[in-house]
Each structure stands twice: as structure tokens, then as C-alpha cells.
């Protein structure tokens, strides 16, 4: 996006050097250029969204032991629901499922994607773990290494900074309108190690306006092997499952407080560059806000 904006800026700057005699024609041309570049930008954003959701769907199939039936794979069902809410087309969803199962639209076998984990150290000594779903590991690791190098970071083991945990993000039914009621309702669910309210974006909260829920989002943490079981039990109790998966939580004694605006800006630039890689599905750091 930044490259495109700089390119458009150069076009606009150069247009001011043209003869004033051609101003009326140039005005129409510039309007068309603006519309054209605006459409290209929107198309690029849409493609980025489609790619991210397609990877999440494919990963849901992979982590669900290859089960492609949403009724039997709760993570896949949740991923498809999120994709639909973000206007991802049926074709994109179906292709993502085929990609994960190793077959193409024609029914022939294709190169199945693999789940890969990459480790690195970023600005300020921040440990980073990157998850990606890729059908070309050499290409993906090249892109990730390039992002680290440009930020003066390095690819080095960092998994020991984190605990691997399962998580379920959900919204309680309306009758559970306080945190105490929520905690009491999940006491009998075995496997939950911790549960707490989390802050969600306004756009995400709007997605639940049609459901009989409180609007407050909670996240439960458990061992990875218990994730699907816990999600199914929460759903039985009326919780709306927003997301679930397996991720990496920074160990409390391994968290790093990022000092200085310049370092923070460099770290943000690196994480953005990593997230912009199509194959990247998740990114975790041990940076602390405290």
C-alpha cells in the first residue's frame, strides 16, 4: 500500500509540470486516474482480506485432522462464519478447503499447504513467533527473513519465550450479563485454565448485534488438546464462539517492555511487514504494554 501511495504521489507531482493549456483534459484524466487507483487499492485490500481468511479456513481444516465438514469441525465452522461476515465469497471459501485437503477445483491432487512456524528477534529485543500456511516453504521463509533483515532483526529460536496454549474467544448469552455470572457458568467445564474479558474492535462487536448475546467478549485459555472440546461445551451453554485456535502466550517473566518511540515504530513496521505476507496467519510477540 505504501509503495502504491508513493507512486500515486509521484504521478500527481509530475502532472503539475504539464502545460496549463491542457488543464481541462488533464483534469478529466486525473479524475479517471484517481478512480482507477482507488479501485486498485480497494481490490488489493479485498484480496488481502480474502487471502487471510482463506488461510485461516485452510488452517482450520489442517488442525481439525483434515475434516472438511463444518458440522464436525467447530474451528472450521467458526472460520467460515467469520469469513461470511467479512463478505468473503463462497468460491474463496471452497477453494481454501480444497487447498487444505490437497485437491484442486478440478478434483486432481495439488500441492497441499503446510503449517510452518518461524522464530525471530525484532527491534528492542522483542521475541517474535510467526505462523504461516504455505505451499512453498522456500518462498515464505525468504519473505520472512527479508522482513527481519530490513528491520535489523534476525531469525533465531524464540519459542522458549512462550507457552503454547489453546484459546476460545466468545460472547456470553444475554442472561450472563456480569463477569461473575460468566465465571460461575463455566466452572464445571473441565480444561479451562483461565477466562477473562477482552477488548474488541467496534467492527467486531457489530457482528454480534443479531445474536442473543451480551456484546462483551471473553477469552478462555486451555491446553491445546482441550480447545475443540471446550469450545463445543461453551457453545452448548449458549456462548457465541467468535474464534478459537492454538497460539503462543508470552511467559510473564519473559515479557519485554519496549522503550522509546523510535524502537516502537521500528517494531510496528516489522510486524506490519510480516502480517502483509499472504501466507502468514498469526503473529505473536512478548512485547509488554505495562
Curated annotation (Swiss-Prot):
The keyword Mitochondrion applies. Keywords: Mitochondrion. InterPro entries: Integrase-like_N (IPR017856), TACO1_YebC-like_2nd/3rd_dom (IPR048300), TACO1_YebC_N (IPR049083), Transcrip_reg_TACO1-like (IPR002876), Transcrip_reg_TACO1-like_dom3 (IPR026564), YebC-like (IPR029072). GO terms for biological process: mitochondrial translation. It holds the Pfam family Transcrip_reg. It comes from the Eukaryota. Its main location: mitochondrion. One of its GO terms (cellular component) is matrix side of mitochondrial inner membrane. It is found in: Mitochondrion. Belongs to the TACO1 family. Present with 1780 molecules/cell in log phase SD medium. This is Probable transcriptional regulatory protein HAH1. It comes from Saccharomyces cerevisiae (strain ATCC 204508 / S288c) (Baker's yeast).
